[in-house]
Amino acid sequence: MVIGSFPVGKIFIHGVKRISKPFGDLLIWMGKHHPFIRRYIIIPPAQLYNTFEVRSKLRMLRLKQPRRIPPLSTPVATRLGADMLSEAFVFGIGAGLIYYELSKTYTKTKKQNQEIEDQKRVLDECVDCISADVERNQREINWIKAALKNVEK
């Protein structure tokens, strides 16, 4: 396992397992006491994972693919399914937090860009006013020069 050589990776994986453990235990308890949840929510992902895992291992070993892969026993499938669902739950929370942070950053950036655009608009209006004043002053200067030329003649 490549991530096993990195201490930060080990800490991260250990943290995820520690966080997802109580939720997994709850799912296992629900699987034991509620057959509907066990049969339709917990066991199918575990059986699907088992099928993909066995087929991929056989494919990597270049062995013949069996027509039917034997299903996992109920306790093993319950444990595996509960672990998978608990880690998916933690992953979902993490993805939700990332989405929240990204949307918050996007909103903040959008607000800053809007403020910059407003400042640009105000500055453009000021420049237009100054340009109008300069043109008016230039016309007055030209009028005064013309008046001085007429007076000198």
UniProtKB/Swiss-Prot annotation:
Q: Which GO terms describe its cellular component?
A: mitochondrion
Question: Signal peptide location in the record?
Answer: none
Tell me a GO biological process for this protein. Answer: regulation of lipid metabolic process
Which UniProt keywords are present, listed alphabetically? Answer: Coiled coil
Top-level division of the source organism's lineage: Eukaryota
Is Plastid one of the keywords? no
Q: Which residues form a coiled coil?
A: 101-153
Q: Which family does it belong to?
A: Belongs to the OPA3 family.
> What is the protein name given in its UniProt record?
Putative OPA3-like protein CG43998
